Amino acid sequence: TDLKTNLLFLVNGLIKIYKYDKFDNEIFLYHIYSNSLISELSNINTNEIYCFSNASFIEDSVVLSIDFLKLQEHFLNNNLLVKELMSSLLKKTNQLQSLVNRELVFDATAKVAYMLVSDLKMFNNLKRQDVSFMLHIQPETLSRVLKKLSRDNIIEIENQQVIIKDEIALNSIFKGVAI
C-alpha cells in the first residue's frame, strides 16, 4: 500500500487496475474510464489516501492531481463539490460490487453477459484473448458462451463484432444473481 495526499482524477483516457497473486500472475480487477476518480478514498476525515492496487494506462490519458487538504479546506468543508465526490465514491463502490459478482457469484455466461451489457464497446475493441483474461475464463469458454448466446438469438456476431439483439434476455442472465 502506498500512502498519498493527493486525489487523482482521470480527466480522459483509460486505466487498468490490477493486482498480483502469490505466483506473480496479474489479476485484472477493473477499468477506470474518463471523468472518474482514480484514488481509493476510504475516509474523508483523514488526510491520507491509500493505493491498494496497481494501475497502468491503456491509452494516452490526462490525469488531474488534487491536493486533498486544499480540496477539503476550500470546497468540502464549505459543502461545495460534496455531491460530486460522493457520486465518484459510489461509482467506485459499484465497481467493487461488480468485481465481487464477477469473481464470486457469476458463472462464465453471466460474466460475459454482464460485460456485453455494461461495456459492449470495450468488448468489441479488445481481442477475445484479452476479454477472457479480464473475465478470468478460458478463451475456449468465452467462445462457447458467445456461440450459445448467438444460437439463442440474444446476440449476433458480424465481422468479430458483437451486436446485442435481445437486451432483456441478456440482462436476465445476470440480474437476480446478485445485482
Report the location of each language-model feature.
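Conserved short histidine dyad/triad with adjacent acidic residue
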Residues: 1-2, 21, 32-36
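Polybasic "coupling" helices that flank or enter modular domains
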Residues: 58, 76-139
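Phosphate-/nucleic-acid-contacting segments
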Residues: 106, 115-179
